[in-house]
Amino acid sequence: MSVAEFASLIALLTSLVALSIDAMLPALPQIAADLAVSDPNDAQLVIGLFLLGNAFGQLLFGPLSDTYGRKPVIVAGLSLFLIGCFVSVIAESFSVLLLGRVLQGVGASGPRTVSMSMVRDLYSGRSMARIMSISMSIFMLVPILAPALGQAIMLLVGWRYIFGTFIVFGVLGLFWLLLRQPETLADEHRRPMQLATLISGFVTVYRSRAALGYSLAIGTMFGAFIGFLSSVQQIFQDTFAVGKWFPYLFAILALFLGAASLLNSRMVMHFGMKKIVRLAMACSPVVSLVYLVICLSVDDSGLIGFMVWGALCFFGVGLCIGNINALAMEPLGQIAGLGAAVVGFFSSFVAILVGIPLGRAYDGTQLPLIAGFAILGVIGLCLVYWAGRDTTQETEK
């Protein structure tokens, strides 16, 4: 398999998470109405519980992939994801729909986590960051197109058929993996799955300043992102009264994320991961603090101001994400599968812990979201500098 095809497969497998989130965003108000959800903010649980299942699923699939190999575990995850989609399709109550979303989240964590391990099996250092960045560039087509796709499906045949789209992509990834991708973990490198092994993985990450610091920094960054994803549809619809334009406005923001990720794939080979991460992580708090002051100084900063702020924050995330994941994984080459699981759990747990309350803090204005970005951005930047002082981390390649 060529590098381009491998990066494309990784992008598809990891994009199931983004697809399962972004395509649902336009449908949240309709789901709340059809399933008699009393509090509109409760509809955000369609996103939050998916991410919760995704976080805990990583602890299962990562160690399993170190024992049984990468391919069988990804197949198991995709199968569970498809089951969750079928549950959501037939759901007649909000609680059953949420059950399906949890199953989807757990299942999607398999390809997401183990795909990172496959990359780590074959690449390291800046080469690994480059593969991740190329994958992210392809992956970014999902948030650009998914909201428009979800809205079109909802308007044409109803929101339940959005899950049918998830099934199509899941089946495509399943057969592509089975037919084209060789196993990347040799038999002699596999280890039996034991509770002590899982605990040792947590201890290894905890003792590594780089792995722990970058994992927590990812959590703060994605926590802000979860808050954004959870409340952005309400902001566009209720605050700015442009709900029907939501997919297209969101696509504009996603373009900045994708462009930054593509730019990073070229920059990282020249400037290194740490420099880019530090610069990118500084973007969110600086821009957010400036925009927060503007919003507090004038009665209405307008949609354009919100879009400029969002575009700059998305651009910073695009520059950062491939590099910071690679930096978190760099000290964990000997436990790639377990390491990816623990890093993913740490970052996802932190993200959910701060992201869901941030989304539910929506009060009819964009102010809680902007303040959350500023605070989490400062914390994330401090963590990045702290992690970068780990003298035991491997030199970037």
Residue ranges and their predicted role:
Residues 96, 126, 130-179, 185:
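Helix-loop-helix hairpin linking two adjacent transmembrane segments in secondary transporters
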Residues 80-87, 95-103, 304-310:
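Paired small-residue
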Residues 28-56:
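Extracellular/periplasmic helix-loop-helix junction of adjacent transmembrane segments
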Residues 37, 69, 90-96, 107, ...:
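Helix-breaking motifs and short loop linkers at transmembrane-helix boundaries and internal kinks
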Residues 100-141:
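Cytoplasmic helix-loop-helix junction between adjacent transmembrane helices
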Residues 184-214:
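Juxtamembrane intracellular "pre-TM" segments in multi-pass secondary transporters
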Residues 55-95:
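Conserved MFS/SLC helix-loop-helix module at the cytosolic interface between two early adjacent transmembrane helices
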Residues 5-37, 228-233:
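Extracytoplasmic
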